[in-house]
Amino acid sequence: MPQITLSAEVQPEQMGQRLDQTLAELFPEYSRSRLKTWIEADLVKLNDRITNIPREKVLGGERIEIIVEVEDETRFEAENIPLNIVYEDDDIIVINKPKDLVVHPGAGNPNGTVLNALLYHYPPIVEVPRAGIVHRLDKDTTGLMVVAKTIPAQTKLVRDLQKRKITREYEAVASGIMTKGGTVDQPMARHATKRTLMAVHPMGKPAVTHYRIMENYRNYTRLRLRLETGRTHQIRVHMAHIAHPLLGDQTYGGRPRPPKNASEDFMEVLRNFKRQALHAVMLRLAHPITGEMMEWYAPLPDDFVELLNALKADYLEHQDELDY
């Protein structure tokens, strides 16, 4: 693995903060959990003194140095996987991710990912941590993602995400009849026993999801959602928590719940929709280098449009029977 050296100076306004919190602010391209691991592994120096206590308080003005081996993106293969590029300049790429595409290689997905595609599309991105990936979408969630082509761009985008300056909106179809919008403000953490899943947990990290009603159908509701935070599976977990799991999300309880007397054509559409009904429809951010406010929209994918058409047709066919 390649070795890198990170250095910075603790700012006066950070006086009294925990060391791990300070490092997360100074090096936002790395997660706080990774920085904490480096501290505990004796890889962090404060004024040339090794410290291994994440909760140690900083005073301001200290010199920080971290010498560490990091994951080598060159070990991943560049693959000629088509990317739907919505926007690109010297600093960022915005893509519209299709379904069935994993963002980053991992267990069970060593290749065939967005990262592999980025390495092929723009080879210099190998020098950027995680090949410039700033945030992720689940394998079967479609829509907009921003990727940084340089380390300065990535650092700024990660910092803006942490400060909730980047707006991400989604469209979804939730199970059940919802009559009003609202906010789910529930912290999240890894599931206690199913470690690949997430769950609402009082000791978890803050997670906030806003939602509003777009359209009601029989047994289902079309939603527009906005993230304040970006926890793994956040929308899926939050909607399941309020008893309205996303249609098609078998992981978090969104198995098909066909309405009474539904047509065979409608049932066929439900059976064929084998993913969570979730699409990242809008992305708004300040360009990390120029500061210009930029905004993109991604049209709903074909399978999502087909689903909405079927839900609407079923609703119209049975609207005389409805009591709401």
From Swiss-Prot:
**Catalytic site:** 138
EC number(s) per entry: 5.4.99.23
Cellular component (GO) terms are: cytoplasm
For the S4 RNA-binding domain, which residue ranges apply? Answer: 17-90
UniProt catalytic activity: uridine(1911/1915/1917) in 23S rRNA = pseudouridine(1911/1915/1917) in 23S rRNA
Q: Which SUPFAM superfamilies match?
A: Alpha-L RNA-binding motif, Pseudouridine synthase
Q: What does this protein do?
A: Responsible for synthesis of pseudouridine from uracil at positions 1911, 1915 and 1917 in 23S ribosomal RNA.
This protein is called Ribosomal large subunit pseudouridine synthase D
Organism of this sequence: Haemophilus influenzae (strain ATCC 51907 / DSM 11121 / KW20 / Rd)
